[in-house]
Regions:
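Membrane-interface helix/helix-cap signal primarily in integral membrane proteins
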Residues: 1-65, 377, 381-384, 390, ...
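Internal transmembrane alpha-helical bundles of multi-pass membrane proteins
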Residues: 112-303, 510, 516-518
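Divalent metal-coordination and catalytic microenvironments
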Residues: 42, 70, 111, 161, ...
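Membrane-interfacial alpha-helical segments at the cytosolic side of multi-pass membrane proteins
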Residues: 71-90, 123-129, 169-177, 229-233, ...
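Aromatic-rich juxtamembrane segments at the membrane interface
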Residues: 1-121, 127, 342, 503-507, ...
């Protein structure tokens, strides 16, 4: 975002800031807030009123890249202005200087993000080559901009926007020529851009949108319509609402199409697969295998060009399919993990995760009284980072907000929870009834547990772990179905977890008096 500036150039930055605010306000006048928020993000780099649900929908569908200022934006604005000047018989040099000045101002106005600076730099190099009567090489231009950006700030190497921006251009320049062909060109071009970026996506979002290739085949060709319509509408809206409403309609219609398309895709099984953050060895293996396939593609293309057409073409097509499948398997297939216990830092509250050696995952509580949006900012990132695709049993000790606030958000997110387990003696409390109602609305099975009840957890083969006398699983130690207490904390679900040689007791907020009684009994 543009910050307050002082000095001899401050007036320039202030004018750009005012222009962005004016165009953003114009969009709010000519269309609804949701559409205006998306257009402001795409055109002006202003995400201040971008709808969170739309942002999340675009992200899990694999099209969140359209919300950033990219090379497409720079090309449309810069090339349109450059061609306009050339039609007016302006010289190559003058057209280049004016176009570069416009693009640099646009970059500053939209926040001058790293990806924008990369795109602007490459555009200026392309225009400079044209002005000098030369052609430009995309990968060399990218190399120059990478050196410049790293020289300016070496820390951008760890910035996701830089990695995504540079990675996408590398994929276009190296992988696309080797994987695409006239038959199915658009599909394989989309695959060749998406495939090399999968580890980067998994490292930053911990999940992969498997249908992004197909979604982008529809989304990207329509982007110029959205961009041009939105830009014209924002300008026209400054002079009159009705012209702006007419001009924004194409953008509005396309964005609604995007929303419907993403909604339909997310209903498909496996639309978004939680992978967790891939470790270094899997990332190395991914790119090593991909490099091997690219060498094979290069040799096969050369053979096809030398006349071995029919047989070579079939083998080439098979190689591309196998390459895609193998690379996906490297990221999606995970080795069996050991038992794992994590006590999350939730502030004033409780949140405990446990994964049995068999792979069954449970969660106990998940709430905080002093951290807002705990589910979105703490619990969900933790689960996705660890590659946890669902929770088999989510135990609720009691219904105080510092134990269930995050769980409530997780339910709203649609994350997979098979069973929610609550104390039978506390099931009639108002707060607990509200939680049970929300769970049932989300089609989550609700189980009532009381003293003596247990849930057995078998290993992957279905057999019981005999390393311990007790069966692996969870046993309820307290309260009984008929127990009562004046203090709600003393009605907490007390659980004993057993997994092979490991066992532990989880008591929620029970008082020391109840603890002493349980020690005597057990």
């Amino acid at each position: 975002n543009i910050k307050t500036s002082t000095g001899k150039h401050a007036w320039y930055y202030h004018r750009l800031e005012k222009l962005r605010d004016t165009l953003s306000a114009s969009l709010l006048k000519v269309t609804d807030e949701t559409t205006a928020g998306v257009l402001s993000s795409m055109l002006l780099g202003d995400k201040s009123y971008l709808d969170d649900e739309i942002k999340d929908l675009y992200q899990v569908s694999g099209i969140s890249h359209i919300l950033a200022i990219s090379g497409l934006h720079i090309s449309i604005v810069g090339m349109a202005f450059y061609r306009l000047l050339r039609k007016r018989r302006v010289s190559y040099t003058a057209a280049f200087i004016c176009s570069a000045a416009l693009i640099l101002s646009y970059a500053v106005m939209t926040g001058n993000a790293v990806s924008t600076r990369r795109a602007v730099g490459m555009f200026i190099l392309t225009m400079l080559a044209a002005a000098l009567g030369r052609c430009t090489d995309m990968l060399n231009s990218l190399g120059i901009m990478v050196i410049y950006l790293l020289w300016d700030n070496p820390m951008v190497l760890g910035y996701a926007g830089f990695v995504f921006s540079v990675g996408a251009i590398l994929a276009i320049g190296i992988v696309t020529p080797l994987m695409s062909e006239p038959k199915g060109e658009k599909f394989w071009a989309s695959v060749s851009i998406q495939l090399p970026m999968l580890p980067v996506v998994a490292m930053n979002y911990y999940e992969l949108p498997l249908f992004a290739v197909f979604v982008n085949l529809i989304v990207i060709p329509a982007l110029p319509v959205v961009f041009i319509s939105g830009l014209l509408a924002s300008a026209a809206g400054c002079f009159g609402v009705m012209p702006g409403k007419l001009l924004v309609f194409p953008a509005f219609a396309v964005l609604k199409l995007y929303e419907v398309l993403c909604g339909l895709v997310m209903k498909l099984p496996g639309a978004s697969v939680i992978t967790g953050a891939p470790d270094g060895y899997r990332i190395f293996l991914f790119y090593a295998v991909m490099s091997g396939f690219l060498v094979a593609f290069s040799l096969k293309k050369r053979a096809i060009e030398c006349g071995l057409k029919e047989k070579g073409q079939i083998l080439y097509s098979v190689q591309r399919v196998v390459c895609t499948a193998v690379l996906l398997a490297i990221l999606l297939v995970k080795p069996k993990t050991a038992a794992q216990l994590d006590i999350l830092d939730v502030g004033q509250g409780d949140g405990i995760f446990y994964r049995f050696e068999s792979g069954t995952c449970i969660f106990i509580d998940g709430g905080s009284s002093d951290r807002k949006q705990l589910g979105e900012n703490v619990i969900m990132p933790f689960l996705k980072y660890n590659g946890i695709q669902g929770i088999s049993y989510w135990f609720v000790s009691h219904a105080d907000s510092d134990h269930i606030s995050g769980l409530s958000e997780v339910i709203d997110s649609g994350y997979t929870i098979e069973h929610i387990v609550v104390a039978e003696a506390a099931a009639k409390e108002e707060a607990m009834e509200e939680l049970i109602f929300k769970a049932k609305e989300a089609e989550i099975d609700v189980c009532l547990m009381s003293k003596g009840n247990s849930i057995e957890i078998n290993d992957a083969s279905g057999s019981r772990n005999t390393a311990n006398e007790e069966a692996d699983g969870i046993m309820c130690l307290y309260p009984g179905a008929a127990d009562t207490a004046s203090d709600r904390n003393d009605m907490c679900l007390v659980l004993k977890l057993t997994d092979g040689a490991f066992s532990g007791v989880f008591g929620g907020d029970i008082s020391s008096e109840v603890e002493k009684e349980l020690v005597k009994e057990f």
